Amino acid sequence: MADFRFLQDPASEKWLIMAPKRAKRPDQAKGQEPLCPFEDHLEEEIYTLNEAKVVKNKYPFAPIHEIVIHSDDHHKNFDELPANKTEDVFKVFRQRFLAHKDKGQVYIFHNQGKRGGESLPHPHTQIAVVPEEVKLEIPVLNPRNVVRKELKFHYIFCPNTSQWPDEVWIAPHRGGRMFGQATDEEIQELSFAVSRLIQIFDLRHGEEFPFNFYIYPGGDWYLRLIPRLKTLGGFEIGTNVYINTQDPLETFEFIKEHFDNPDFEKITSQHTASYERSV
């Protein structure tokens, strides 16, 4: 049997991926202290930028499925890596996007923590190139009538229709482009923004919190950061109608207050968040 198959439901016309071999991939996020889980991948490096490395995913669910290993450090992720190393990771994202943009839909996504879908503890991001005929149901950028925090090259906002508590979007001021067209200055600012958001959310939740982010694969690109402390309930799973128990405006005010100069004591004493229960 092939490693994966794309299947379309004839009734709903929605797509799914059948990939039973992925159930056999190692799961080292359960607590044991392993050797580097990517040790046996390094002889097959596809691309390298300083410590950031790209290797093939041994358990793919797409024709092209790569892993970006962030650095040589087994534990430090975006919130703890030096700025230059985080910037290198995002430059690798851009390079791989450009390498694959004519082969399909380049979907860059990151899983952090067990509840965020992470199975290997060494910080890494995945890149899956999905065939064009497979329709990806991803929200499009619609920044109208939203309150923004302005950066030099980007703006940060929390959509009024956020599906997840503390959901945050980052988008460039210059629209109409794909992620591969981001400039070095934009990459530098984007990598800093992601790192800072993770830092203050770590404090807000009192622990290293689980999250996902992805980069929109089409034009008018954006990065969407989704904390994963909330558990989906049966209503949301069955109807695909999400119940958000956190006011996006409160999330935005929290970001606006602490993004530039985080007040660590105030975050931990006054701005903690708790919404782990299902609804």
Per-region residue spans from a language model:
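Active-site microenvironments that recognize anionic phosphate/pyrophosphate groups
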Residues: M1-H122, A128-F179, I198-V279
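Gly/Pro-rich active-site loop or hairpin
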Residues: G180-Q188
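Internal alpha/beta scaffold segment
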Residues: Q188, A193-R196
